[in-house]
């Protein structure tokens, strides 16, 4: 059994330890905000936070999560259900288009802003490498 936390709640996973985190989240825990895009860790649609750092869930095996903390887009809002400031900015700036890639983009942005609180356009372009499935971004 592999024990870890997802969005602050304990998880005791007794399935295939080599299952990718993406499928454990979506199929076992019914957390469908994390999206499947490429399956090879390139597009970023599946970005979650593991111990506070952005990681691609489609290439992360559950076996690597023992004792770790996973945050998904569903867990990004505060306990009071107040949107995270990045989520709020996404809405205020009217960013949403089709929305498929946005959970991953939001998660990547939150991680990026922790180390780059006042980024330049060049910083953003160099560090946010998520791909947009519909081509809007």
Regions from the PLM with identified roles:
Residues 1-137:
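Signature of N-terminal electron-transfer/Fe-S-associated modules in redox systems
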């Amino acid at each position: 059994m592999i024990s870890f936390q997802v969005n602050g709640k304990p998880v005791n996973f007794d399935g295939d330890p080599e299952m990718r985190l993406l499928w454990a989240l979506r199929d076992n825990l019914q957390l469908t905000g994390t999206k499947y895009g490429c399956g090879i860790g390139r597009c970023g649609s599946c970005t979650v936070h593991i111990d506070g750092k952005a990681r691609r869930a489609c290439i992360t095996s559950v076996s690597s999560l023992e004792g770790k903390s996973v945050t998904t887009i569903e867990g990004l809002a505060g306990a009071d259900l107040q949107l995270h400031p990045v989520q709020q900015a996404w809405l205020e700036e009217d960013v949403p288009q089709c929305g498929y890639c946005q959970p991953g983009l939001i998660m990547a942005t939150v991680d990026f802003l922790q180390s780059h609180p006042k980024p330049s356009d060049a910083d953003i372009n160099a560090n946010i490498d998520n791909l947009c499935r519909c081509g809007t971004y």
